[in-house]
Amino acid sequence: MAGGIKAWPEDERPREKLLRRGAPVLSDAELLALIIRTGDSVTGRSAIDLGRALLQECGDLRTLAGATVSELCAVKGMGTAKATSIKAALEMASRINSERLMICSERFTSPEQVYNHYHYAFRDRRKEYFMALLLDGKNRIMREIQVSEGSLNQSIVHPREVFNPAVRESAAAVILVHNHPTGDPAPSREDLEITRRLREAGDIMGIRVLDHIIIGDGRFTSFVSAGLL
């Protein structure tokens, strides 16, 4: 449809559609258009055109969520302001999911539960993220701690980064969770050594390391299930 969105019939404009019928009826491109807000005068693309171009470039929302600001700006008509608005909106969605997990009163009784709760939060990450889940005596989440970002090594993942918060929260145990951006959840030598050091530190402090879950692409490794912990 030619022309700017304001020239469109009212019932076809994303904002009016949302107000009348609710957000679920909007397409992905229309939702992106509301985040982008304006089109680009140089290319003549409307906000919906830009949303469609982003989806065509990335393929789907999952890939879009993992795109960098620079990659978003590579789409003609996208500038820094539009790209950062998209990144902020997607980050908020990720945090909402994390908050939902944090208030969960369900006990973690299996590695599958941990994976099912966290794989959405980790699957689009292009760097390694290492997280510690602080648990109470009934294995319920008290708090999530992001320990490091980037390639794991012993200087970054230090026992104090895990156990200082655990002591402050009076945690009874911890579960370690991190991702492999390659999609292969097989533990590396560094993973094994870091887990050993954290387990030993936990034993000294009376805070058990219940498991270490490595999240890959659609699969995971549990150190306990694999006999590594």
Swiss-Prot record:
SUPFAM superfamilies: JAB1/MPN domain, RuvA domain 2-like. A motif (JAMM motif) lies at residues 178-191. One of its GO terms (molecular function) is metal ion binding. Residues 107-229 form the MPN domain. Disulfide bonds: none annotated. Gene3D superfamilies: 5' to 3' exonuclease, C-terminal subdomain, Cytidine Deaminase, domain 2. The keyword tRNA-binding does not apply. Zn(2+) binds at residues 178, 180, 191. Keywords: Hydrolase, Metal-binding, Metalloprotease, Protease, Zinc. One of its GO terms (biological process) is proteolysis. InterPro entries: MPN, RadC_JAB, RuvA_2-like, UPF0758, UPF0758_N. Belongs to the UPF0758 family. This is UPF0758 protein GSU0386. The lineage of its organism: Bacteria, Pseudomonadati, Thermodesulfobacteriota, Desulfuromonadia, Geobacterales.
